């Protein structure tokens, strides 16, 4: 069997690798190695798509010689993506392309001038409609009541889960939490290797802290996942929940609470919108959400026109009405 970076022996495409590269010297492999597993799969697929597009299917991400790419290649990729993909998807794939070329430059495989021109392609501009929504306070109450009306242990577990989601965590981050990641003194949760492999601290407000404490009184303080599955017999199963289990729980509680359809990620939108509504600055909110760029955080703001009106209303204009209210005479 050939190595991951070894090209086919009969691959004569001019952009194909002529000889195998060690993974430590392969720009695509170096780039992918720095990503979280989920992002790695997504970006590997993007790079495979780019390689196949450039070589009519002759190469994939590991058999393409990325150091041979020039502006004419990257410009052609951008043009093809504009026709084939939604702008968000196309820009994500172009970002992967730029990052691989950057690794090729760092590895001294591409001339700096050739690199500068190859990556000098603009992102695809678009004004996307807002996806998702923020949950209202009444909807959150309905979800919690649906959990509390469940006499089984799943009710307490699910309230704890929703409380953690309301602190802005992604569902993958929720199921990855361990008991040792929770600090009851501060209400802090250590989110390890979140998106982009970044660690951060999240914090639970008082009500959420009480909900988690009630679950922990049942769970106990032994090491392991913070949230456990509960089987049909009502017994705790000492293993980690899955992402899909979180989705199932939310769908179930949403139906029980007569809440309009929502996604797990809508809790992050709610968290960010509520914090901004409370007057928190966007830098602090972006850190709590685990965003490296505050511009990403701003995209989660679902407050709409009312928030803009209220923000302007807080501005002070140093004007006082004239004592003589009559219109000035000509």
Residue ranges and their predicted role:
Residues 1-330:
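Conserved catalytic core of the tyrosine transesterase superfamily
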């Amino acid at each position: 069997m050939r190595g991951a970076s070894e090209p086919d022996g009969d691959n004569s495409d001019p952009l194909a690798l002529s000889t195998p590269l060690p993974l430590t010297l392969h720009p695509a492999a170096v780039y992918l190695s720095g990503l979280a597993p989920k992002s790695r799969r997504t970006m590997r697929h993007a790079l495979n798509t780019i390689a196949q597009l450039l070589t009519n299917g002759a190469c994939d991400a590991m058999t393409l010689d990325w150091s041979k790419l020039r502006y004419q290649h990257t410009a052609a990729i951008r043009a093809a993506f504009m026709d084939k993909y939604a702008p968000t998807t196309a820009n994500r794939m172009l970002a992967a392309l730029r990052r691989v070329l950057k690794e090729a430059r760092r590895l001294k495989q591409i001339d700096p001038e050739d690199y500068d021109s190859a990556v000098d392609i603009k992102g695809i501009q678009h004004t996307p409609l807002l996806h998702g929504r923020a949950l209202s306070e009444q909807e959150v109450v309905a979800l919690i009541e649906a959990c509390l009306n469940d006499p089984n242990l799943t009710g307490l577990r699910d309230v704890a889960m929703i409380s953690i989601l309301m602190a802005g965590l992604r569902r993958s981050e929720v199921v990855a939490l361990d008991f040792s990641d929770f600090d009851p003194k501060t209400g802090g949760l250590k989110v390890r290797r979140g998106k982009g492999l970044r660690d951060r601290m999240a914090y639970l407000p008082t009500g959420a802290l009480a909900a988690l404490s009630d679950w922990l009184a049942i769970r106990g303080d032994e090491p392991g996942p913070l949230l456990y599955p509960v089987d049909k017999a009502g017994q705790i199963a000492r293993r980690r929940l899955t992402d899909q289990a979180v989705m199932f729980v939310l769908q179930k509680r949403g139906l029980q609470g007569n809440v309009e359809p929502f996604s797990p990620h809508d809790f992050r939108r709610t968290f960010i919108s509520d914090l901004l509504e409370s007057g928190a600055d966007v830098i602090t909110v972006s850190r709590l959400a685990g965003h490296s760029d505050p511009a990403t955080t701003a995209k989660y703001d679902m407050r709409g026109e009312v928030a803009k009106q209220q923000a302007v209303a807080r501005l002070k204009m140093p004007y006082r009405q004239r004592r003589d209210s009559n219109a000035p005479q000509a």
